[in-house]
Amino acid sequence: FSFFFQYSVKANDLPSGDNVVSGSVIISTQDTSMIINQSTDKAIIEWQSFDIGQNNSVTFNQPSINAGALNRVISGDPTTLAGSLSANGNVFVINENGVYFTTTATISANSFAASTLALSNDDYLQNKLQFYSDQLSESLASVINKGFITTLDGGFTALLGGAVNNEGTINANLGKVGIGVGQEIILDLSGDKFLQVAIPIDEAITILDENEEEVDLLIKHSGTMQA
């Protein structure tokens, strides 16, 4: 089995095709910036696209650092983050077709997670961060970080998928960093086992990078992580 991650983003790209599934959210766009005002502790937004161009910014204004916004891309296209994403709370980006952070991407939040595994609405609303994929053996999707991800003191960063490559910088001062690959991944924010992974043992998997060259490891790390 193999995957080939293709990515492209235009300079003027901002997330589009929003549908607020849960919570109270007001979204406004002006020129190169998008403001997402969230007034409930939890919000779920489905998007046709969640791309951010290099000179563009997306800002989540949330009621507290414990508030969270789950952003799910449903179009079938991968997500490319090349600009700025900031939040005073927690942001989750779910795209089962891939998430790519370019070298110009900057992420700043209390906590941040990007995943190509699914997370159900019910689990999220019940504080169960249980990510899963029923198609891992058929189609692997990757998370590739070449940018800068920073979370507030005590926050967490999680990159989860069929394959994860971190070439960028992740700062989680006094917090946690989790890079996980598997068919099922659970984030336990209250216990000692922050990241729990179930990996299929009966799969022969070949990973291809963006140049269609074989990669030996499902997790590659050549960047910087501080927690």
Where is each model-derived feature located?
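Extracellular and secretory-pathway beta-repeat/beta-biased strand scaffolds
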Residues: 1-227
